[in-house]
């Protein structure tokens, strides 16, 4: 822990402690003994591996010529520079001339108007394969011309094959905002060729809906939520989908986990109601094993077409905040960049961190606003508009802006720790116009960041694993019901789902009639209406002065919106004065003084029950099982944490009525070896043993981060006292696939966990935030033992 005097500048490095008073007293004691000096600390920090030597940094820079402000960051002696490099995109291979591909004259003429004379090779390949009717995955960087690669052949096919007034192609985007953002670009092209394009989503007005149904567009832009809803309700809109020949899915990497599993079934349902055999096109900037993933998502064989993009050079710096928090580092970087008039996007991995960062940045006079899910759509659009019009210097955002929404010119991206392919997506937001860009990966004060500090090359190898789980029993049950609503199921259909169909017949959710299976609407209507394909369950609506200002999904809402919790919303803090759960699912918040010094962190308890063991194996001498689990969760209290200091103040506060939630999911369970040698040296063997298992649970979850696709935040963990049993489970109801990825790579997770503990320099018995602590810990990181 770095300690310094704000007046005289003397500084020292001390062992980590949660109690700031203990740190201060230790600092004074060392000062009195003459152990704290004004000179020589940097040399000691280099020897300890806390910062890099100037020689090492110069070797990193090599023949590159970074700008002065980048040099100052590299040589600041405040952080450990794990990596510095110039990112250069390879020049894209050029393909055929526009007039050599046999495109319709109107298409060629319009491309010439746009000054496009020649295609990139990947565009040419995609155009030809799509025109020939092949299923295609287009993998190419952000802003490289992917949209043109699928739009041009679709328009070519429409001109050759379409009957006007029927849907020929559906373009699906993961969010309404992105669909609306892409619409003008697609419409501009289609209008020129006299092809009708329309958007149909939750914001489409009644008159527009009527027009779309009466005179269907050749290209329909929508999302999977809309397709799901209208298919099972058999609306007039669903009836116009049957003529579809091509389904285009942009940003395909988004459809991972529960959401992707639901999308897999919606695509299956769309196939059932379409008169033609559907052709599939997927596009993405970042997908691990894109071909295999898309074949699972679509249930069809796919061809992979890869491309590169032309873009300016980007200075990339990976920093580890040795002497301060990650947030302070990110705020300082934002300040340095915005002071140079560089428009900056700052990505955090959680709502809370995005809000806290914006709050601290505003104190540094940075013109910044928050953009995240859970804020009202009109507020988010306002932030996008202000940034695009240069009225904002910076945006503090979550992955909501990872996708291709146009926010105008961006010079710099600062990101917290995420898998490298998602970082590439974020970096792709900067320097799109060929100017020099700047990208900073700020490692955190957490175990996996400690690992990457010492092993930066591994970071670039840890590609995010994208996965779906078609065998998720809850998704399968809901989607088979929806399928029966879309169109009666024939007796010889869906043999692979026969067990689920028979279960629904027994439960009278569906009825056998004339060799067909039809839905029992009276019984299942409310069940399907309450189902979310995004796997996020129900939400708690948030009200301020009787006006809805946001929402938060369950179960995380119970941890953030319990009575007296401090809740962050759009850069401000509020206190929860009432939570109505589970009857009506709303929370009322009230304003608090700006100088209120605390925020809250909930305290939780969890109990697991093994329902079914799917499979088990031996991994490095440890038996690990992959299971169906029943998790019971209780929020029973909270602690106050001081802003800026990030340490607990005061006593734990117990809730009058604990909040309870339970769900079925998937996970792993293993029996950790008994730490006999450590226990023999301990005065309290039982405490040491239980605390060691608790620390193991934390470190394995953090060690699995990136190995499972950077989704440790989607995993929960439970260690059962001195039993040695450790459970790690999917936070999503029914399971997301993350714990299965951990099960498959368990040996690697254990190996990485060992590195994290051994390489952390702390001597604290309980460990520290960089080895054994977890910010998600429901016990406030108590009862931990590192050794």
List where the protein language model places each region.
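Helicase-associated low-complexity/disordered flanking segments
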Residues: 2-4, 11-121, 135
């Amino acid at each position: 822990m770095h300690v310094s005097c704000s007046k005289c500048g003397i500084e020292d490095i001390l062992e980590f402690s949660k109690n700031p008073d203990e740190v201060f007293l230790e600092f004074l004691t060392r000062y009195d003994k003459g152990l704290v000096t004004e000179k020589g600390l940097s040399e000691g920090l280099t020897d300890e591996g806390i910062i890099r030597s100037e020689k090492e940094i110069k070797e990193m820079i090599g023949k590159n010529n970074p700008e002065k402000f980048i040099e100052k960051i590299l040589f600041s002696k405040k952080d450990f520079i794990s990596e510095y490099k110039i990112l250069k995109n390879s020049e894209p291979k050029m393909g055929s001339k526009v007039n050599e591909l046999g495109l319709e004259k109107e298409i060629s003429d319009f491309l010439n108007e746009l000054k496009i004379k020649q295609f990139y090779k990947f565009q040419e390949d995609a155009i030809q394969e799509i025109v020939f009717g092949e299923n295609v995955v287009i993998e190419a960087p952000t802003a490289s011309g992917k949209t043109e690669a699928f739009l041009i052949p679709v328009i070519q096919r429409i001109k050759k094959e379409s009957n006007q007034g029927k849907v020929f192609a559906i373009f699906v985007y993961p969010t309404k905002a992105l669909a609306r953002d892409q619409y003008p670009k697609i419409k501009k092209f289609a209008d020129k060729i006299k092809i009708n394009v329309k958007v149909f989503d939750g914001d489409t007005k009644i008159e527009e809906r009527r027009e779309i149904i009466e005179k269907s567009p050749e290209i329909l832009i929508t999302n999977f939520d809309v397709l799901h809803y209208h298919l099972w309700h058999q609306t007039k809109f669903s009836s116009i989908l049957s003529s579809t020949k091509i389904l285009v899915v942009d940003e395909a990497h988004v459809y991972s986990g529960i959401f992707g599993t639901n999308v897999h079934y919606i695509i299956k349902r769309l196939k059932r109601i379409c008169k033609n055999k559907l052709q599939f096109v997927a596009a993405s900037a970042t997908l691990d094993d894109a071909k295999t993933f898309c074949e699972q998502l679509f249930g069809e064989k796919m061809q992979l077409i890869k491309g590169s993009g032309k873009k300016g050079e980007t200075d990339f710096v990976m920093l580890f905040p040795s002497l301060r928090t990650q947030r302070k580092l990110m705020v300082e970087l934002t300040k340095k960049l915005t002071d140079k008039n560089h428009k900056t996007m700052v990505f955090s991995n959680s709502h809370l961190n995005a809000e806290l960062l914006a709050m601290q940045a505003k104190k540094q006079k940075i013109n910044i606003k928050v953009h995240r899910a859970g804020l009202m759509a009109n507020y988010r659009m306002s932030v996008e508009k202000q940034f695009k019009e240069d009225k904002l210097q910076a945006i503090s955002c979550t992955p909501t802006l990872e996708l291709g929404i146009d926010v105008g010119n961006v010079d710099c991206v600062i990101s917290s720790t995420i898998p490298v392919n998602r970082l590439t997506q974020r970096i792709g937001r900067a320097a799109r116009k060929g100017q020099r860009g700047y990208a900073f990966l700020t490692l955190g004060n957490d175990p996996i960041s400690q690992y990457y500090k010492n092993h930066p090359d591994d970071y670039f190898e840890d590609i995010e694993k994208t996965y779906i789980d078609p065998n998720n029993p809850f998704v399968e049950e809901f989607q088979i019901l929806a399928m029966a609503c879309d169109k009666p199921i024939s007796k010889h259909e869906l043999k692979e789902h026969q067990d689920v169909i028979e279960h629904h017949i027994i439960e009278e959710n569906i009825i056998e009639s004339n060799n067909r299976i039809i839905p029992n609407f009276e019984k299942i209507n409310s069940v399907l209406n309450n189902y979310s394909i995004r796997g996020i369950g129900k939400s708690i609506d948030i009200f301020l002065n009787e006006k809805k200002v946001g929402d938060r999904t369950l179960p995380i809402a119970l941890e953030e919106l319990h009575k007296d919790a401090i809740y962050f919303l759009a850069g401000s803090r509020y206190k929860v004065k009432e939570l109505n759960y589970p009857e009506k699912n709303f929370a009322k918040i009230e304003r608090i003084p700006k100088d209120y010094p605390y925020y809250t962190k909930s305290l939780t308890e969890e109990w697991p029950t093994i329902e079914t063991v799917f499979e088990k194996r031996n991994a490095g001498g440890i038996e690990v099982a992959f299971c169906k689990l029943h998790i019971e969760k209780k929020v029973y209290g909270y602690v106050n944490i001081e802003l800026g200091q990030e340490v607990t103040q005061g006593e734990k506060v117990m809730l009058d009525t604990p909040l309870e939630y339970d769900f079925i999911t998937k996970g792993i369970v293993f029996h950790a070896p008994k730490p006999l040698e450590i226990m023999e040296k301990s005065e309290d063997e039982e405490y040491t043993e239980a605390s060691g298992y608790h620390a193991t649970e934390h470190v394995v979850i953090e060690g699995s981060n990136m190995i499972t696709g950077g989704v440790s935040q989607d995993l929960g963990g439970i260690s059962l006292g001195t039993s040695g049993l450790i459970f790690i489970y999917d936070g999503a109801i029914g399971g997301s696939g993350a714990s299965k990825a951990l099960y498959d790579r368990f040996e690697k997770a254990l190996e990485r966990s060992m590195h994290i503990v051994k390489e952390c320099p702390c001597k604290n018995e309980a460990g520290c935030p960089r080895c054994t602590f977890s910010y998600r810990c429901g016990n406030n990181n108590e009862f931990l033992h590192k050794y």
